[in-house]
C-alpha cells in the first residue's frame, strides 16, 4: 500500500522522521540534544549492540565478534549518535566560527595541489563527522563537489541534498542526473577544484576488489580513475572525534603514475585501514562491509 499513491508507507515514515529530526533537534538546547542522542546510543548498545557493527569491528580489532569489547561497541554507537546529532544541528550552527575553530592537520598537501593547478580528489571513509570537514573546506576554500546516493523515496533524497547544499556543497546524484557524475567530477578537477568522495564501500560489480583488514571487500573505482584521467592529486583524508571537538587530517598524495586502478585503490584501502584502526569507535559502518557478510544471492551477483 502506498501513501498518496506515490511513496511506500515505510519510505514516507522515514522521510518524515528525518524532517522532524532536522526541525526538532535544531531547536533543542545542546545539553538536551546530547542527552537524547546519548540515551539512544545506550539503548542501541543493549544486548551486545547491532550484530553487523560487531562483525565489522571484529575485523578492525582482530578478534572474533563475540570478543569485541562491549566498551568499543558503546563508544562506536555514541560516536554514531553524535554524528547524527551534529548533522541535525549543523545547518543552524555558525559556519564561519566553525571554519575558524577547526584545524585540519597537513592541509598544505591540498593547498599545494591547488596552487599547482591540478585539482584534488579527497577520498574519505565514513568516520567522525565528514560533513563538518566539508563545512571547514567551504569556509576556508569555497564550494566543492561531492556525490550522493539516490535514496528512496525521492523526497528523502532531496532532503539530504538540500541539507548538504545548505552547507555550501555542490551535490551530484549518483544516478538519474542530467549527466554522469564522473563526467562532471572530471570537469571540476580540470577546472582546478576539489572534490570529496566517500570511498570505502562499493559492494557492486563496478567496485574494485581489495584486501581490507585481511579480508576481501570492494571499494569505489572512482577516486583512482578520476585522478588517472585528469592528473588530479588523490589524497586520503580521515576525520575523527577529538573530545568535544573534531580531528581531521589530509594524508600525502597517493602515487597514481602506474595507471593501475586496482593497485591505487588498494593503497587507499591500506591508508583507510591504518586510520580506522587508530580510531575504531569513530568508523560509522553498520552495514555489511566485506563480501563474506553478503547473502548468497548478492555474492552470486558479484560473481564471487
Swiss-Prot record:
Extent of the signal sequence: none
Annotated compartments: Cell inner membrane
Impact when changing residue 164 to A: 20% decrease in transferase activity
Superkingdom, natural source: Bacteria
Catalytic machinery residues: 126, 200
Catalytic activity: a 2,6-O-bis(alpha-D-mannopyranosyl)-1-phosphatidyl-1D-myo-inositol + an acyl-CoA = a 2-O-(alpha-D-mannosyl)-6-O-(6-O-acyl-alpha-D-mannosyl)-1-phosphatidyl-1D-myo-inositol + CoA; a 1,2-diacyl-sn-glycero-3-phospho-[alpha-D-mannopyranosyl-(1<->6)-D-myo-inositol] + an acyl-CoA = a 1,2-diacyl-sn-glycero-3-phospho-[alpha-D-6-acyl-mannopyranosyl-(1<->6)-D-myo-inositol] + CoA
Residues the record lists as binding hexadecanoyl-CoA: 126, 164, 206, 229
Any GO CC annotation of this UniProt entry: plasma membrane
Task performed by this protein: Catalyzes the transfer of a palmitoyl moiety from palmitoyl-CoA to the 6-position of the mannose ring linked to the 2-position of myo-inositol in phosphatidyl-myo-inositol monomannoside (PIM1) or dimannoside (PIM2).
PANTHER family: LIPID A BIOSYNTHESIS LAUROYL ACYLTRANSFERASE, PHOSPHATIDYLINOSITOL MANNOSIDE ACYLTRANSFERASE
Note on domains (UniProt): The acceptor mannose ring localizes in a cavity at the end of a surface-exposed long groove where the active site is located, whereas the palmitate moiety accommodates into a hydrophobic pocket deeply buried in the alpha/beta core of the protein.
Family that this chain belongs to: Belongs to the LpxL/LpxM/LpxP family.
Name recorded for this polypeptide: Phosphatidylinositol mannoside acyltransferase
The gene coding this protein: patA
